[in-house]
């Protein structure tokens, strides 16, 4: 049995696999109709007790989530487990944090680069700029929701973790 795998027996490629009246099924998956370039949205989850509290103090800590998906798929509600999702994190914080999740452009729309793009004065890595825009928005506006802009933690999973590294080094 093992000998067959080691020898590399030739395959008879002379037999037809499809006939002229047959066709292969389309291998391209149908696009999700919700997919759009218009994706710069934030979810801001504020516990009721934080939202109702007077906005006189420094506010509560803020946790910003950047999802993973290989920079090609995903969205702001993409969590690998309930414990890393907003409900689990808010529960473990005794409802004393604000959770922010942001979307960003993916695939070629978000991470296109190369000499042709550079020669045409295009902007590479727009997905990272989308993330930066979201983080800047949080810095400017989170106090309106009871958050402390000086206590913002950014976390991510997989490509989201890589994005955090890129945001720190840019």
Question: Residues of each region from the PLM?
Answer:
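Surface-exposed, low-complexity/disordered Ser/Thr/Gly/Pro/Asn-rich loops and linkers
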Residues: 1-33
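Serine-hydrolase-like catalytic core of hydrolytic proteins
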Residues: 29-170
């Amino acid at each position: 049995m093992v000998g067959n795998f080691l020898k590399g027996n030739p395959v008879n490629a002379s037999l037809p696999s499809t006939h002229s009246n047959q066709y292969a099924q389309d291998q391209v998956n149908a696009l999700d109709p919700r997919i759009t370039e218009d994706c710069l949205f934030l979810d801001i989850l504020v516990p009721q007790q934080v939202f109702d509290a007077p906005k006189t103090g420094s506010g509560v800590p803020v946790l910003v989530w950047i999802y993973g998906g290989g920079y090609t798929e995903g969205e702001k509600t993409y969590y690998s487990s309930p414990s890393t999702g907003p409900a689990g994190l808010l529960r473990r914080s005794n409802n004393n944090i604000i959770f922010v999740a942001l979307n960003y452009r993916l695939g070629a729309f978000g991470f296109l680069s190369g000499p042709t793009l550079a020669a045409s004065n295009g902007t590479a890595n727009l997905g990272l700029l989308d993330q930066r825009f979201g983080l800047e928005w949080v810095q400017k506006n989170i106090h309106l929701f009871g958050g402390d802009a000086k206590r913002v933690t950014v976390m991510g999973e997989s490509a989201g973790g890589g994005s955090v590294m890129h945001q720190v080094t840019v």
